[in-house]
């Protein structure tokens, strides 16, 4: 299927696009990216990362880094998500992405309906990753970066299927969580993780099960 991209002539000088990946998963960091595209160096096929194949995202990931005026990938860790909540952690990670840019944008366009506190003017754009090329580019950088990290965690924490579901609460993930217990990269503030942790702790206290290598440590 032909994957058409956004109109690159929409790119404006020194406007950063900002997006996040990983608000919904039960494990791993929330990853953000900020990108300022170069209007003189077109990138064909930019679109919401979720609308692209993995192979296309990987190619665009390299091309964006080569052709953009500047870009920065940031994150908020699991501990920050649990401490702040996922919304505030996402805003913090977006703030870090914009602050990490080597060029100060005159405007930051944020995917979604709210903006983090920034030192530059900003505006939210609902479904911006399918409207604004710079936001689409940011969504690609964030998604490829996070997906690669999840693939690495698959090797560190086998049995959970993390490389496949990327941490999202699929039946496979929920079953593994109940069977194996949470890992150190699971978000304890998320209800399914907390429930699995408490259930497993209760069973262990009863002496009927030995600790799993994946079990969260207090």
UniProtKB/Swiss-Prot annotation:
A Gene Ontology biological process term: mismatch repair
Keywords: Cytoplasm, Endonuclease, Hydrolase, Manganese, Metal-binding, Nuclease
E.C. number(s) listed in UniProt: 3.1.26.4
Subcellular location: Cytoplasm
Catalytic reaction list: Endonucleolytic cleavage to 5'-phosphomonoester
Keyword Hydrolase: yes
GO CC terms, sorted: cytoplasm; ribonuclease H2 complex
Chain's role: Endonuclease that specifically degrades the RNA of RNA-DNA hybrids.
Protein name per its UniProtKB record: Ribonuclease HII
Organism placement in taxonomy: Bacteria, Pseudomonadati, Pseudomonadota, Gammaproteobacteria, Pseudomonadales
């Amino acid at each position: 299927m032909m994957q058409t991209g956004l109109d690159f002539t929409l790119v404006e000088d020194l406007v950063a696009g900002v997006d996040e990946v990983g608000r919904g998963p039960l494990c791993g960091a929330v990853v953000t990216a900020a990108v300022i595209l170069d209007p003189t160096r077109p990138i064909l096929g930019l679109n919401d990362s979720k609308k692209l194949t993995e192979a296309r995202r990987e190619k665009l990931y390299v091309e964006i880094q080569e052709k953009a005026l500047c870009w920065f990938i940031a994150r908020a860790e699991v501990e920050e998500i649990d401490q702040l909540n996922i919304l505030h952690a996402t805003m913090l990670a977006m703030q870090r992405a914009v602050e990490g840019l080597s060029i100060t944008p005159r405007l930051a366009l944020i995917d979604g309906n709210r903006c983090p506190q920034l030192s530059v003017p900003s505006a939210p754009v609902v479904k911006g990753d399918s409207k604004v090329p710079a936001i689409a580019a940011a969504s690609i950088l964030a998604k490829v970066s996070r997906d690669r990290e999840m693939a690495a965690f698959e090797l560190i924490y086998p049995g959970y299927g993390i490389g496949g579901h990327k941490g999202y609460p699929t039946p496979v993930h929920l079953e593994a969580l109940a069977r194996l217990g949470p890992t150190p990269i699971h978000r304890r503030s998320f209800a399914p993780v907390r429930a699995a942790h408490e259930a497993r702790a209760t069973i262990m206290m009863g002496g009927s099960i030995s600790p799993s290598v994946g079990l969260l440590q207090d």
